[in-house]
């Protein structure tokens, strides 16, 4: 996974490195101290969940089709950005119908602003 994010970062550097980039997805690694997360930060990416002043929902994105447990912290789905982008809000969407979740991941919704 760390090599995968490394490939993405190297390919992005071939383009105009001054352009803003938004990178999202299921990285199958916890945000924080995992190698892919560290590699992304070293490449200049910032994490919308960390940067956003307004947060909603728990810091959990993998659900195993169940509600998150109190105090759980397992963000493996990230919204990363770099360049002239800022995070205004970030939310883990806990949508379910009668306790049935449509997927084993909670969607992440980020409010981002692109500066001129």
Each model region followed by its residue ranges:
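Active-site regions of metal-assisted phosphoester/phosphodiester hydrolases
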Residues: 1-116
